[in-house]
């Protein structure tokens, strides 16, 4: 985007870690931030940090797995901060362990958050983004979305899906004013590891 100052950004998983850091970085550049997180305490803490920078923030407690709840967010954000021009789909979870030991429930859990959470976010906000003079979607993948790792099979699966989804969506929107970026962070110590599943989850801490 040509400018960030005066824009409204929606950041999921903004209550901690990369989501909080991204929110603060955008706020420092003049964006108002809609802080979206399933944990209200973390979301409020992030919002307070943003406001301490002299920037507006609103808090929206939401589970990205829930398409109905995600569908409610655009009108909530617009009512609090105005129409958004930036969407950062950052919310995610991880797992570590042998694929053979993972249950179907484990796989559905990580796919629902890491993949469907991104899809629900894009579906909910794309109509609003398409009305802006310039807009951008940022989807958080991982280095394992480029090169899958053993004992991180389910996580690699989801981040590879985010990569492919983002690249396809970018190509679909290339002639519009909505850009799409997919980000591939390396290993970063955040509290995503606190909720990790799998027999080797402890090694992530």
Where are these regions (language model features)?
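Substrate-binding pocket helix/loop in short-chain dehydrogenase/reductase
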Residues: 98-99, 103-108
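Residue(s) in the substrate-gating loop at a strand-loop-helix junction
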Residues: 142
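Conserved glycine-rich cofactor-binding loop
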Residues: 8, 15-16
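The beta1-alpha1 cofactor-binding region of Rossmann-like NAD(H)/NADP(H)-dependent oxidoreductases
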Residues: 40-41, 61-72, 104
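Active-site loop immediately N-terminal to the catalytic Tyr-X3-Lys motif
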Residues: 99-100, 147-153
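Active-site helix of classical SDR
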Residues: 122, 158
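SDR active-site lid
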Residues: 174-205
């Amino acid at each position: 985007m040509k400018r960030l100052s005066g824009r409204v950004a929606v950041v999921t998983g903004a209550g901690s870690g990369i989501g909080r850091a991204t929110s603060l970085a955008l706020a420092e550049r003049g964006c108002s931030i809609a802080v979206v997180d399933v944990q209200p305490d973390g979301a409020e803490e992030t919002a307070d940090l943003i406001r301490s920078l002299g920037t507006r923030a609103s808090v929206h407690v939401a589970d990205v797995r829930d398409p109905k709840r995600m569908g409610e967010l655009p009108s909530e954000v617009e009512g609090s901060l105005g129409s958004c021009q930036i969407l950062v789909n950052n919310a995610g979870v991880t797992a570590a362990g042998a694929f053979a030991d993972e249950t179907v429930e484990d796989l559905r859990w990580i796919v629902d958050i890491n993949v469907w959470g991104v899809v629900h976010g894009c579906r909910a906000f794309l109509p609003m983004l398409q009305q802006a003079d310039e807009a951008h979607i940022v989807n958080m993948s991982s280095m394992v979305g480029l090169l899958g790792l053993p004992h991180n099979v389910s996580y690699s699966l989801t981040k590879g899906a985010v990569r492919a989804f983002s690249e396809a969506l970018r190509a679909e929107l290339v002639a519009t004013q909505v850009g799409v970026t997919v980000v591939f962070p390396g290993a970063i110590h955040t509290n995503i590891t606190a909720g990790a599943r799998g027999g080797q989850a402890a090694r992530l801490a």
